[in-house]
Amino acid sequence: PSRFWLINRKTAEIEYNVIPAGDVRLRVAQTGQLDVPDTYLACQYENVATVLIDGTEVTLSQNPGRNAMASWTRNGFDYLLLCEEPQMNLLGGVIQDFVTQTTASTVSGQQVTQE
């Protein structure tokens, strides 16, 4: 990971540098609380497909050469992988690793404070 932060105290975001295409961002939040960027929500995707990866239903939304995202839900958490201007089907090339190797959990007794 190259950077990470918390958005609106509910959504964690981790930025990864994927060579050669640049950055992808992974967002995770408890189910129903995921903050999706407006630029991705407002987009009309040319290609939308649902695929099964390791028993998890994943929705891929892509526009060739423009924004792409993959979303899935597992064990009480929503996941969203975001790519801006992906090259050579970057999303399709990395999505299996993100779906199969990413897990999230809550931390009991911890309180997030703002400084």
Each language-model region and where it sits:
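Surface-exposed amphipathic alpha-helical segments
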Residues: 75-115
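Short, solvent-exposed recognition patches
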Residues: 1-78
